[in-house]
């Protein structure tokens, strides 16, 4: 440019005006020519830093100009630029990048997520909303952390991820996962509603967790009211991965893990068992069992079975998935195929195997959007077997060491006990579960098709139809066998039970939405009509009478019986929602839903759900001066009413047996009798929730914090009310709306992300507190008793209710001076006379602690440096008590096996102990429900830890990303609990939630995995 300037001065000084003008033109042409010669073509590929996948539609702008281009479906671009230019790469939800051209002709860019933005879109009921605009309580799951939980059930992924959400699971392959949101809201069903891609499902059990894109938890009435009667226990919304316009991308993930029981019990070996059991017999005035008497010829000295060593082995877990994604704007696709298998860590055929496929298609043509979803799952589960309600784990721990695992002389080939030799009733769990076949097969097909058309600007109509079909076959064959004197199955008892059936659910959603922006005002409205139908069919057959080795088919049984049942449930709902925002400062939302269901009688089959919520973004107010490091302050609150309709079909119709007979003067006369007396006025349970919260964003929103308080009042709860025996009903009670309870608590969550340096890290944590109080039980307030628990008005649901101990009777004088304690002897437990009436009775039982954790928490830590990354997920709960029934059984001093603690039992020469004398029959009931077996349920776990390494791949390789990782689960448990795991899954999640009767312990799992993107 300096040369041209001098040329201009020279021409102006020496040449006439015409010649000077000609010189100017020549100079301009030269300048243009020089400029053209300085431009260059810059090309490159833009990818997502998160998954290394091409990013189509990214804008590339030359700074300070209008020159712009976009990336194609493969993420490629080309643009003319000068060395002095700066390219700006930008795209929605990604942080913009500026790169100087200089001499570069190829510039590849990896765009990072814009972590400072609060414009993340979250899925809510029948729609989406910006996270910053939420006025209700919606917990967003950190999927990067949640997906590192190796599991067959997506519900397990929620554990510790969202404040106020508690999850209980077990180590049984394919076992049930128990999830609660903000405590217990009902005496019956407390399970939340699951919605997958807009489809209502009972649970996500049949769906591959690896195919999930996002998960949101709707916790308050404002967010869940749009689901009406189903939303009372909270809603979990799951969105699976959708197709993205672009070239075909293939992802493969493979994982193989090894599972072992994390903790074993200390139980007695042969000598310890024989010592304690012999003492128990002598204390009861009995002779020593021949098998335990060294002076008897039947004394057992050659069998010393450690049943835990015999049963526990290394279980295997496998998970392989293959996903395809790509397409065009007209039709994009995502298909995921997933295989999962888990063999048990107990030596038995029990395992769980599942094959699933999910296909999502979506596209857009002008004003018309459309899509479909097709999913299929086939699963096979071999179930564990228990005897008369005793769990397999409880039976395993109680198995005596003088019983062999195998015995070729017994029918079936497995060992057992002998009544005359050992006198013990002890189940060979290994033999029991290898002889019995208990299989469940499931085939599930789901389909969904939808279309959305924009009628005029802002006004859209959407039609959504879905279909869900489950077919199942359950078979249980109990063959003729001999597992000891108490567990002999004769030919007449050998049986085959077969249950086949199907469940079909159809939904039709008609939705109309409208959006309008007028200056600072924004309106969003939703109106809809929802129809549904559920059909259930079951056919069962039973065959009895099989010879040993006979084919387990119904036609070979000596006798057969069969039956079937069929049920249909229909429902119609009307929904509406309105959102209003003024100047991005004041937010308001209202929801309304009316449900009508055939579950209730005609007079009570309709109910209304509604909610109101509002938010104030203080940080957007001009009159509030905030420090620079404070970016966001928002206050929000909500109130709403929901319902609960989880009752059986025809629950309002009394059942009559018209084939009953009555005995009159020794003659049978025909007649009728009431089978079940039901309330024709039974109605919906009600749930009202109030919620207030404060949200903060600091340091460019890298640090975010939320504090929340809620009160949830449940009324009209279904509960059994006693009936006079004159009604003829059995049981003599009727279930009606006569219960109420309250849950309240605080919830806190915080997160911090730092991605500005070579070492990137993030920290997130959540804490939830909960207080449960029962307000009403029936008409007269009669308490409800569970296993070692009592539910009473004014207290928490399912509190432990037991006796208190006061040492051991050391001599006859102490025994005589104590309150009357029937059948007590020296060496027995002394119980406290709580009511002071001079005798020990049921009236002396007291509440010993709540079983619902007072607090639960979770913490995610993750970091990455260059190609390495590491993450840890800690989770815990506390403030609750656990009744350790397994420990009670092992401390009973009877014929079953014992805890090693029993070796320190009381004797006249060993009085400095708190372990009572063993005595057969336990006349003093030393093993009754008491604080001897109540323990703190507090724990903290290293639930997941993963270390990954991203293998460098050439830019020209067809492999876009390759990663190796090592994953560990349940690696460390910090707890004082004696049992295998304080995080157990109780069969009864309500009245006996804190009763550990032998749930399958969660195993310690170490997995090796590979991820490859093509």
Q: Positions of the model-derived regions?
A:
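Hydrophobic beta-strand positions in extracellular immunoglobulin-like domains
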Residues: 46, 111, 200, 374, ...
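Extended, hydrophobic alpha-helical segments in both membrane/secreted and soluble proteins
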Residues: 212, 357-359, 508, 572-578, ...
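Transmembrane beta-strand segments that form the barrel wall of outer-membrane beta-barrel proteins
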Residues: 254, 339-341, 588-597, 639
């Amino acid at each position: 440019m300096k040369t041209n300037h001098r040329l201009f001065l020279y021409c102006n000084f020496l040449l006439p005006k015409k010649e000077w003008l000609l010189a100017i033109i020549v100079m301009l042409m030269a300048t243009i020519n020089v400029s053209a010669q300085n431009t260059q073509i810059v090309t490159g590929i833009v990818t997502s830093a998160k998954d290394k996948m091409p990013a189509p539609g990214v804008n590339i702008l030359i700074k300070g100009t209008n020159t712009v281009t976009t990336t194609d479906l493969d993420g490629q671009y080309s643009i003319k630029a000068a060395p002095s230019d700066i390219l700006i790469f930008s795209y929605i939800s990604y942080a913009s990048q500026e790169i100087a051209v200089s001499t570069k002709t190829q510039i590849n860019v990896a765009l990072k997520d814009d972590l400072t933005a609060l414009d993340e879109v979250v899925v809510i009921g029948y729609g989406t909303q910006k996270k910053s605009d939420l006025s209700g309580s919606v917990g967003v799951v950190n999927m990067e952390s949640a997906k590192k939980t190796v599991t067959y059930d997506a519900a397990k992924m929620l554990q510790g991820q969202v404040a106020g959400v508690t999850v209980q699971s077990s180590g049984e392959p394919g076992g049930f996962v128990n999830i609660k949101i903000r405590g217990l809201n009902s005496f019956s069903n407390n399970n939340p509603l699951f919605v997958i891609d807009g489809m209502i499902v009972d649970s996500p059990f049949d769906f591959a967790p690896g195919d999930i894109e996002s998960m949101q938890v709707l916790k308050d009435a404002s967010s869940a009211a749009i689901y009406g009667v189903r939303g009372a226990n909270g809603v979990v919304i799951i969105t699976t991965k959708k197709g993205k316009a672009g070239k075909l991308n293939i992802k493969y993930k493979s994982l193989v893990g090894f599972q072992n029981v994390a903790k074993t019990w200390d139980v007695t070996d042969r000598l310890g068992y024989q010592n304690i059991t012999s003492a128990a017999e002598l204390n009861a005035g009995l002779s020593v069992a021949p098998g335990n008497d060294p002076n008897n010829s039947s004394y057992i000295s050659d069998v010393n079975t450690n049943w835990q060593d015999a049963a526990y082995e290394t279980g295997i877990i496998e998970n392989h998935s293959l996903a395809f994604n790509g397409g065009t704007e007209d039709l994009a696709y995502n298909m995921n195929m997933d295989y999962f298998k888990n063999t048990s860590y107990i030596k038995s055929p029990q395992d769980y195997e599942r094959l699933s496929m999910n296909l999502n298609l979506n596209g857009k043509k002008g004003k018309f959007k459309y899509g479909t979803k097709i999913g299929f799952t086939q699963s096979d589960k071999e179930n564990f077997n228990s005897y008369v309600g005793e769990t397999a784990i409880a039976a395993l721990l109680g198995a005596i060491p003088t019983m062999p695992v195998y015995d070729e002389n017994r029918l079936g080939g497995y060992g057992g006990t002998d009544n005359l030799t050992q006198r013990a009733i002890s189940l060979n769990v290994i033999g029991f579960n290898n002889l019995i076949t208990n299989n469940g097969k499931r085939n599930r097909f789901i389909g969904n098709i939808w279309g959305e058309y924009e009628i005029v600007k802002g006004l859209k109509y959407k039609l959504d139809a879905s279909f869900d079909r489950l077919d199942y076959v359950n078979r249980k064959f109990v063959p003729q066998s001999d597992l000891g004197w108490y567990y002999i199955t004769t030919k007449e008892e050998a049986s085959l039970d077969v249950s086949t059936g199907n469940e079909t659910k159809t939904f039709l959603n008609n939705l109309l939405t409208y959006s309008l922006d007028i200056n600072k005002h924004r309106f969003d409205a939703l109106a809809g009509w929802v129809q549904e139908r559920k059909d259930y069919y079951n056919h069962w057959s039973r065959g009895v009478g099989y010879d040993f080795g006979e084919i387990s088919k119904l036609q070979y049984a000596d006798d057969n019986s069969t039956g079937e049942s069929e049920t249909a449930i229909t429902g119609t709902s009307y929904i509406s929602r309105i959102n209003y925002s003024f100047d991005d400062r004041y937010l308001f939302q209202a929801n309304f839903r009316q449900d009508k269901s055939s579950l209730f009688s005609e007079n009570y089959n309709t109910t209304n759900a509604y909610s109101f919520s509002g938010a104030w973004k203080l940080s957007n107010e001009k009159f509030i001066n905030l420090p620079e490091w404070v970016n966001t302050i928002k206050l929000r609150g909500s109130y709403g009413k929901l319902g609960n309709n989880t009752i059986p079909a025809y629950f309002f119709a009394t059942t009559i047996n018209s084939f009953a007979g009555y005995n009159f003067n020794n003659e049978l006369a025909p007649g009728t009798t009431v089978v079940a007396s039901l309330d024709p006025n039974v109605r919906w349970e009600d749930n009202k929730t109030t919620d207030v919260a404060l949200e903060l964003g600091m340091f460019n929103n890298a640090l975010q914090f939320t504090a929340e308080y809620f009160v949830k009042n449940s009324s009209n709860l279904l509960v059994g009310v006693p009936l006079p025996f004159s009604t003829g009903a059995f049981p003599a009670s009727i279930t009606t709306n006569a219960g109420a309870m309250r849950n309240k608590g605080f919830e806190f969550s915080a997160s911090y992300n730092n991605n500005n340096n070579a070492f990137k890290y993030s920290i997130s944590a959540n804490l939830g507190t909960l207080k449960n109080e029962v307000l009403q039980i029936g008409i007269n307030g009669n308490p409800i008793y569970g296993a070692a628990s009592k539910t009473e008005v004014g207290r928490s649901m399912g509190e432990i209710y037991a006796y208190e101990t006061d040492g051991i009777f050391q001599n006859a004088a102490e025994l005589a001076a104590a309150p009357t304690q029937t059948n007590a002897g020296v060496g027995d437990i002394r119980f406290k006379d709580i009511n002071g009436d001079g005798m020990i009775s049921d009236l002396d039982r007291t509440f010993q602690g709540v079983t619902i954790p007072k607090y639960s928490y979770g913490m995610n830590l993750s970091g990455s440096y260059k190609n390495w990354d590491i993450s840890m997920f800690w989770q815990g709960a506390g403030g609750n008590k656990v009744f350790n029934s397994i420990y009670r059984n092992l401390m009973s001093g009877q014929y079953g096996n014992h805890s090693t603690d029993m070796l320190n039992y009381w004797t006249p020469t060993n009085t400095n102990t708190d372990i009572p004398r063993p005595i057969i029959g336990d006349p003093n009931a030393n093993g009754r429900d008491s604080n001897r077996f109540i323990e703190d349920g507090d724990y903290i776990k290293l639930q997941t830890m993963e270390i990954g390494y991203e293998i460098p791949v050439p830019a020209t390789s067809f492999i876009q990303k390759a990663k190796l990782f090592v994953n560990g689960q349940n690696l460390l448990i910090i707890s004082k609990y004696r049992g295998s795991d304080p995080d157990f899954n109780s069969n009864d999640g309500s009245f006996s939630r804190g009763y550990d009767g032998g749930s399958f312990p969660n195993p310690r799992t170490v997995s090796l995995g590979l991820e490859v993107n093509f």
